[in-house]
């Protein structure tokens, strides 16, 4: 085994490796609208403050791109204090509306990344400590994310991190399955791996694989998530703790 604590490292992308709130909020606001005649920089600057605040408020409960639509449809005075409350709101949205939104959002992200590449990349920020962590585990790191693979790859390339990544599993709705599949393919016992995510649901599900699971407290979190992490006996990982992994 290499001279580090784990044989493989599994990392979420948004909220663990990169802060992409600005881009995700804009994507949600503009998806389905004809904005191709405007620059991305101008679009980013005029996302309504009230919507940006609502998106950030709900972000801890949104696991995948299809969840983002909730932030655009619910009233601003609705309060969400648990994952179950969020899922109840989401269940009230027609499945076809969600499907259309995801298609529109992916198309818009692809347009931005191909027509205004530098601005699109610049709307993302790498969290402190990630560079060093990836360097220590170079070629033993898998990104398991709900984000699409191409966008994740582009951002990693931009920040010079792609050299450390063994693979990206994009649009992953079942992260436990992804972890098990990679471990099987690499002949690694899941118990010799570490999974880091800022979403409580993902952490709980992956803990069933036998992998060591750390909940990233610097990601999209709320007080309810801190309480849920304690109830689920999840190990909390602070940004400053990454140097000890």
Model region roles, listed by residue range:
Residues 6, 138, 165-166, 210:
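Short, well-ordered alpha-helix to beta-strand connector turns
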Residues 16, 23, 149, 201, ...:
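Conserved Rossmann-like nucleotide-cofactor binding loop
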Residues 50-121:
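A metal-dependent, Asp-based hydrolase signature
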């Amino acid at each position: 085994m290499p001279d580090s604590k784990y044989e493989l490292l599994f990392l979420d992308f948004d909220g663990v490796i990169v802060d992409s709130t600005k881009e995700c909020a804009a994507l949600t606001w503009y998806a389905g609208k004809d904005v191709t005649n405007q620059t991305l920089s101008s679009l980013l600057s005029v996302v309504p403050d009230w919507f940006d605040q609502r998106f950030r408020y709900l972000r801890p409960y949104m696991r995948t791109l299809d969840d983002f639509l909730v932030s655009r449809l619910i009233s601003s005075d609705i309060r969400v204090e648990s994952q179950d409350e969020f899922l109840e709101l989401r269940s009230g949205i027609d499945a076809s509306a969600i499907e259309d939104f995801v298609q529109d959002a992916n198309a818009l992200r692809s347009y931005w990344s191909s027509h205004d590449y530098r601005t699109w990349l610049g709307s993302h920020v790498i969290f402190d400590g990630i560079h060093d962590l990836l360097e220590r585990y170079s070629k033993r790191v898998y990104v398991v994310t709900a984000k699409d693979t191409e966008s994740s790859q582009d951002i990693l390339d931009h920040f010079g991190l792609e050299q450390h990544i063994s693979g990206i599993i994009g649009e992953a709705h079942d992260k436990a399955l992804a972890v098990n599949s990679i471990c099987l393919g690499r002949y690694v016992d899941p118990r010799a791996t570490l999974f880091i995510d800022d979403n409580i649901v993902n952490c709980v599900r992956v803990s069933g694989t036998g992998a060591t699971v750390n909940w990233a407290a610097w990601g999209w979190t709320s007080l309810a998530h801190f309480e849920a992490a304690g109830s689920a006996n999840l190990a909390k990982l602070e940004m400053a703790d990454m140097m000890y992994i």
